[in-house]
C-alpha cells in the first residue's frame, strides 16, 4: 500500500539511521519525476522480494525524502546477502521494461484478488479504503493496492542509480502489540552521479551523528538500566548545557522576560481542565497516587504558566507579561521512534508565554522573532525556512480574533523582512502559528522554533484582566519555544559543528601539554591562572610523547592545545596550536588569558591574535 495512505506507516523499531540532506535537483520537468521513480522502485523491490521469497507478505511501501522502503512479513530475517540478491533481481525486472498500469476495481474484486494471494495485511488495508479501489500492476503478474503515481514503464528507472541500504524492524501500524515486520530501505535517483552524491552526504551525516560524537567526546549517554529515552549529561556535556542555559537566560532578561520555575507533576484535575487528558493522554505517563490524590508528570509547561497568571487579579496596565522557563517535561515515545537526543522521553522545553492585549500582538511577535534570531545566530544558524499556518475548518475562537491574530503574525514577519510560506488551514484548532526550520552545515532542515497563539487555554482557565473601562477581558496568549527541546537542539548543534564546537562553547577550551616533568609545576600554575580567569583548562599528565598528546587532543576536538617546554616556561608562555587556525606561535600567558576572556565574552568561535606579535617575533 503506497501513496496518500502514508499515515499507516509503522514506526521503526530498530536503530534509526542518521538523517541526511536530500540532493538538490535541478528545477526541470524531469526532476519532478523523482517521487514517481522512488515510488515505482518500491514496487519493483516488492516484486523482487516476493519472487525470491514466496512466503513474504507485503504491507506498505511509500517513497521518502531520500528514497523508499517497503515493510514485509517474512519468516526469516533478511541478510546482507539477501539484499544483494534482491537488488540483482530488481535490475532484471527493470531490464524487462514492464509497464506500470493503474486499474480501478470494486471492493469485491479487490477482496477476491487479495484472498487469492492470501495477503491478510492487504485485506486489513482494504477495510480503510473507499471506492473506487485503485491497483497498480507491474507487468502481468504482480500488483498492489496503490493510489500512485508511478512511472509508465520500468525503462524509465535507471538501474545504476539505486541502492538497497539497510533492513530495520517495524511494527504493523506502528503498534508494538502487532506483528513485527522487516523494513527494507532503499534510495533511488535519476542519475548515477546523484546516487554518488547521496552516498557522500550519507557518509558525512554519519560522521556528524550526535550519538557517536556524544560517546566519543564524553558528552552524554542513555543508560538502559535507567530506561529508554532518559538522558544522562556527563560533566563535559553538562558544562556545555550550562553555558547554553546561561546565555538563554541572559538573552531573555535583556529581552524583557522574567523567569519561572514550576513543578514537574500536577494533580490529574489540572490535565482535565487543560484538555491534555482529552487530546494528549497517549503521550503522557500514567498517574501516580499520593495521599489519595492522583498526579501525572507534566508533558507541557503551559498550564503551569496559566495558573501563575491566574494567581492574582491582572490589569491591562501590566500587559504584556512575558514569562519564560527551562522546564523539564515528560512524554511517552514509542520505542521505535526514539533517536539519541532528537526524540527522548524526558527533555527540557524552553517555553515562554506572553499574555498581551489584542493590539499588542504584532509588536510582541516581532520581539519574539528578534530574540529567536539573536539566539539561533549565536550558534551559527542563520538560514531559516518559515511557515505561517492559518485557521483550519474546525477551530475555536471568534473569527474576528483569528483574523486579528493572523494579521499580527503576518505584519510582524513583514516588519522583520523574513520570507515565509502560508499553510492555509494548517493551524491548530486553538490558534494560528509560525514554525521555523533551521538549515545546518550540510543542508538539512530541522524544525526548531514555534510561535503559537492560543485561544483555548485562556478560555478553559477563564483567564482575564481588568480593561481600561473596568470590564473583564480575555488576554491573548502566545506560546513560544526557540530551541524547542534543549536536548534536541543540542543534538542538532552537535551535528552542525561535527563536534568541533566554537571556543566559547567548548567544554574544555585549552589543554596544556607539558613536554617534560620539569615544566609540570609551571603548567599547574598556568592552569590555575586560566581557571581563575574563567577559562576551562586542563593538563595532560600522561607523560606520553608530544605527538601522541597532540593526537589525543585533536581527537577530543580541543580548540587550543598549549605545548609547554623549558623554553616556553622560561618565557612565561606556551606554543599554541588551534583546531581552526593552525599554529598560533608562542604566546605569553597574559596575552592568552586576555584573548580567551575576550573570546568568551563575545562568544567567538576561535582565538584571534591579530595585530599582535608572538614572543618569538
Curated annotation (Swiss-Prot):
Primary localization class, coarse: cytoplasm
Catalyzed reaction equations: tRNA(Thr) + L-threonine + ATP = L-threonyl-tRNA(Thr) + AMP + diphosphate + H(+)
Any single GO BP term: threonyl-tRNA aminoacylation
S-S pairs: none
SUPFAM superfamilies: Class II aaRS ABD-related, Class II aaRS and biotin synthetases, ThrRS/AlaRS common domain
Cellular compartments per GO CC: cytoplasm
Domain of life: Bacteria
Chain residue ranges for the region called Catalytic: 209-502
UniProt keyword Acyltransferase present: no
Cofactor info, note text: Binds 1 zinc ion per subunit.
Top enzyme class: ligase
Binding site for Zn(2+): 302, 353, 479
Subunit field text: Homodimer.
Record protein name field: Threonine--tRNA ligase
The species this protein was found in: Synechococcus sp. (strain CC9311)
UniProt gene name: thrS
